[in-house]
């Protein structure tokens, strides 16, 4: 049945790790170049990438996929610059953003960014979403390419949840997001409005990450111990990178 699967397959999803690091991805893309006429013409090809491979590899990827119909590219980020690099160890935000803005030129069917909403990203999340909306409007106008985002609230590990933050910071970040939503709501998809409203409500109303693991003093102790070790082992600096949350962190 494997030899006939391509005739009836409706969607093929490629995730990772980073797919561009796998020889299997390149073999598949080579197959698409020579056998495309055999594929179900309505098949949706979804590829999830961190978008930070070496430039040469990324350019090779663009060349390979530029003629694939119904191509959807997924990536993940939720903060800007050094805060993004801190949260996602190994991230190079400048490289990520440079590669992101190259994507609409190949005219995929859709580009999707998945945000994992944790305590740390809340400092620069509105700024990050500003860039998303700016590109969303430009790419639709110039390339007729759809770009959207999801806000997926982190639940585990519990000590990285937004709910570990003190009430004053949660209120501050909630208000920032509500202001952002009010300003940009006309440019958002219904799904994006729903995700942003849900996060605003979550920061405002929800008090415990989940009942089985809620011990706020312990979670905050774990938060401090984890990032202290993270700084030492990865040569990072929490307080310098997150000046708003860092003031509270320094007092734990």
Name each model feature, range by range.
Residues 30, 34-38, 59-63, 67, ...:
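Polar/charged alpha-helical tracts
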Residues 7-25, 35-58, 65-98, 110-119, ...:
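Core AdoMet radical
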Residues 117-123, 141-177, 193-203:
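Flexible glycine/acidic-rich beta-alpha junction loops that bind and position SAM and/or redox cofactors
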Residues 77, 93-96, 125, 170, ...:
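A structural signal for well-ordered alpha-helical scaffolds and beta->alpha junctions
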Residues 28-31, 61-62, 88-92, 127-132, ...:
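Short secondary-structure boundary/capping segments
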Residues 1-8, 39, 67-68, 99-111, ...:
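A structural motif corresponding to the C-terminal end of an alpha-helix
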């Amino acid at each position: 049945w494997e030899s006939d699967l391509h005739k009836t397959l409706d969607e093929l999803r490629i995730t990772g790790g980073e797919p561009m690091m796998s020889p299997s991805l390149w073999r598949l893309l080579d197959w698409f170049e020579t056998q495309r006429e055999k594929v179900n013409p309505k098949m949706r090809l979804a590829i999830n990438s961190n978008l930070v491979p070496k430039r040469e590899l990324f350019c090779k990827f663009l060349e390979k996929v530029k003629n694939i119909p119904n191509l959807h590219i997924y990536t993940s980020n939720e903060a800007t610059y050094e805060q993004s690099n801190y949260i996602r160890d190994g991230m190079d935000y400048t490289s990520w953003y440079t590669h992101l803005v190259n994507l609409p030129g190949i005219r995929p069917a859709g580009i999707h960014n998945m945000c994992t909403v944790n305590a740390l990203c809340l400092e620069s999340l509105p700024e990050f979403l500003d860039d998303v909306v700016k590109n969303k409007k430009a790419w639709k106008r110039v390339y007729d390419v759809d770009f959207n985002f999801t806000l997926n609230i982190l639940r585990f590990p519990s000590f990285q949840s937004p709910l570990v933050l003190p009430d004053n910071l949660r209120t501050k970040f909630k208000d920032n997001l509500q202001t952002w939503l009010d300003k940009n709501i006309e440019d958002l998809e219904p799904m994006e409005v729903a995700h942003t409203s849900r996060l605003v409500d979550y920061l405002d109303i929800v008090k415990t990450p989940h009942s089985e693991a809620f011990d706020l003093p312990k979670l905050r102790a774990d938060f401090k111990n984890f990032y202290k070790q993270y700084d030492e082992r990865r040569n990072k600096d929490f307080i310098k990178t997150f000046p708003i949350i860092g003031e509270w962190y320094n007092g734990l």
